[in-house]
Design a protein with these regions (language model features):
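Gly/Gly-Pro- and Ser/Thr-rich, intrinsically disordered tail segments characteristic of DNA damage-repair
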Residues: 1-227, 233, 237-240, 278, ...
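DNA-contacting surface of Y-family translesion DNA polymerases
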Residues: 8, 183, 191-336, 411
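Short, charged/polar surface micro-motifs in flexible loops or helix N-caps
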Residues: 14, 37-40, 297-300, 346-349
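Short small-residue beta-strand/loop micro-motif enriched in glycine and branched aliphatics
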Residues: 73-74, 300-304, 351-352
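Short Gly/Ser/Thr- and Asp/Glu-enriched loop/turn motifs at secondary-structure junctions
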Residues: 103-107, 146-149, 285-289, 334-338
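Short, hydrophobic beta-strand segments
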Residues: 108-114, 303-306, 353-359
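C-terminal hydrophobic structural anchor segments
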Residues: 323-380
Length: 417
């Protein structure tokens, strides 16, 4: 098989760029697109480059961001608007290839191997895409041009904003080896710290470490890290359409106070699971995987996930699975500051269900009917018109409206372990 031609396109400061396009008076200013601006749990989802230069970062609580940048303009997130622009960007991609794999709303891989005969070299195609998105939508993109998905993403991260980086087998070591190990896809903060404890700080050092040694440190994931660091990745670009592009629905929050007990965590997981389940029902979807994200008060975090026997969009079922994942993986070494829930591997709500001798599908159907009735009441009378009793056990935590606050995070926000 010949060399593939893969692009990774990353819309720069996407949410902020969309807001500046819709509101020209914001251009050139320090802005942060955030969750609920009125509460401490509101966080920065995306910041403009002027704000970033002042130290404002994704995932930072609003109050902390304002300490870094006194003139920071807070803009509430508008998810529907970002979905619309994401669709516009995808239309440009589709003019060059039908092999487009979304990675969140603001990133995508394109396999243009079969397109070079029609449109010219990979670099020419990248330049055309960049110019069109800037001209037609007013948004800049950074593009990595390479021979697989992992290295293409490294390329898009290399020059921001509005850059194009070419990584080929011939210049791979020169460009990639000096980069921090944390720049590699799926190397989050916890993995980077563990690598650092073994004296590995760059991708080059990781590539030169024996794969069996890495397996001893990280299990089978060690083999993957070794391959990725050496530029080895045969993962195909997953062909998608409008109905398959959304693969997961997640919601997380930086809490109004530290979480210190299982009861605190259960309350938060109920709130977040309700939001995730409602959004899946809005999409006509169910999830086959439940994932949790946990971050302590020193900002160290991890994710854990569980594959389900049957897909679900039942709020309380997702909450119970998430809580069991938490209990099995956290023993309270520190208080928690952030927590999240994600439903992944989505399928249509009417997808086939595997029945067994001990199936609880009848009970699940009853819970689905209850959830739908609650959805109807909340749509008519407001989100707080119907609440679970646990919400009233803590007015501070229970005051979070996870669904309307729409704490929507870029994909990378969950990749911490």
């Amino acid at each position: 098989m010949g060399q593939r031609h893969i692009l990774h396109c990353d819309c720069n400061c996407f949410y902020a760029s969309v807001e500046m396009q819709e509101h020209p008076e914001l251009r050139g200013k320090s802005i942060a697109v955030c969750g609920d601006p009125e509460a401490r749990h509101g966080i920065v989802l995306t910041a403009s480059y002027p704000a970033k230069r002042m130290g404002v970062k994704t995932g930072m609580p609003i109050w902390e961001a304002k300490q870094h940048c006194r003139d920071l303009i807070i803009v509430p997130a508008s998810y529907g608007k970002y979905q619309k622009y994401s669709g516009y960007v995808r239309e440009v991609f589709n003019d060059y290839t039908d092999q487009v794999e979304s990675f969140g709303l603001d990133e995508a891989w394109l396999d243009i191997t079969g397109s070079v005969g029609l449109f010219g070299s990979p670099v020419k195609i990248a330049k055309e895409i960049s110019a069109r998105i800037k001209r037609e939508l007013g948004i800049t993109v950074s593009i990595g041009v390479s021979f697989n998905k992992i290295t293409a993403k490294l390329g898009s991260d290399y020059k921001k904003p509005d850059g194009i980086t070419i990584i080929e087998p011939e210049n791979y070591k020169e460009i990639v080896y000096p980069l921090p190990a944390g720049d590699l896809l799926y190397v989050g903060a916890a993995t980077q710290r563990k690598l650092g404890s073994y004296g590995i700080s760059t991708i080059g050092q990781l590539a030169e470490t024996n794969s069996e040694t890495l397996k001893g440190w990280f299990g089978v994931m060690g083999y993957t890290l070794s391959a990725f660091a050496r530029g080895l990745d045969q993962t195909p670009v997953a062909k998608q359409n409008a109905h398959t592009a959304i693969k997961s629905v997640g919601n997380s929050a930086t809490t109004p106070r530290d979480l210190t007990t299982d009861e605190d965590v259960w309350l938060m997981l109920v709130l977040l699971s309700e939001s995730v389940a409602m959004r899946m029902r809005d999409l006509g979807s169910k999830c086959n995987v439940v994932e949790i994200y946990v971050r302590d008060n020193e900002l160290s975090g991890f994710t854990r996930r569980r594959k389900l026997d049957n897909p679900t969009n039942v709020s309380i079922e997702i909450a119970r699975i998430a809580f069991d994942l938490f209990k099995r993986n956290y023993s309270w070494p520190k208080p928690l500051r952030g927590i999240g829930v994600r439903g992944a591997d989505l399928c249509p709500a009417d997808c086939a269900v595997q029945l067994g001798f001990f199936s609880n599908e009848e009970k699940r159907e009853k819970l689905e009917h209850i959830d739908k009735a609650v959805d109807t009441l909340r749509q008519r009378y407001g989100y707080r018109s119907v609440q679970r009793a646990v919400v009233y056990t803590d007015p501070v935590l229970g005051g979070i409206n996870a669904y309307d606050d729409h704490n929507i995070h870029p994909v990378g926000y969950f990749h911490t372990a």
